[in-house]
Amino acid sequence: MQKKKCTAIVLAAGQGRRMGTKTQKQYLEIIGKPVLCYSLEVFQESEIIDEIILVVGKGQETYCKKEIVEKYQIQKVKKIVTGGEERYHSVWNGLKEVSKDGYVFIHDGARPFIDQEMIRRVYEEVVQHKACVADMPVKDTIKIVDTSEFAEETPDRSRVWLVQTPQAFENNLIKNAYEILLEKEEYSVTDDAMVVEKILGKKVKLVRGSYENIKITTPEDLDIAGVFAKIQKK
């Protein structure tokens, strides 16, 4: 069977307010290289990914093209598009550039430590199940709390997983789900799997990600990322 086209949508339009820096988190450096470049380079080197759609904040298009795409020779970037007000608006702006046939891998540009094996695992599952996400089992006990921050419930830890990216879908499936989402604007969603689950009622397959596949959100995350990057360079 001939391989279908695979597109990576890399989201780099977030404001990163929790980082507390003037520079947005995706452009902060980890041992001399911008956070965003790490995942772009992995997709660039992947035999599975055919093209990249890069979604950036308004006014950052030229900077990203010159200082990221051209400087680091990310030749698979087909187009740089402007993000929207919320994450799901940014995803939709990227999806509009994706063809009807094939698969799309939606990834947070603030997650620098994906690898080729993870992409391969996600690809194998999306071909079989049409919708899958990278996840990892939680290590700590989780508490459900009330509005006053008192514990209400302790869920079974074996059934609680940390959701990561990439999240991969058959193109028509995810585009259809997002079209309905944008048309109704009545759902609260925090990731792409939720869009498919809530709107289409489709089950999403979980795929092992990595505990190193952290999202850079706070200054502490950047410190941890520096350690991971140094280990990878050895």
Regions inferred by a protein language model and the residue ranges of each:
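Residue-level signal for inorganic ion chemistry
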Residues: 10, 36, 94, 108, ...
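Conserved beta-loop-beta/alpha segment of the NTase-like Rossmann-fold superfamily
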Residues: 79, 85-145, 164
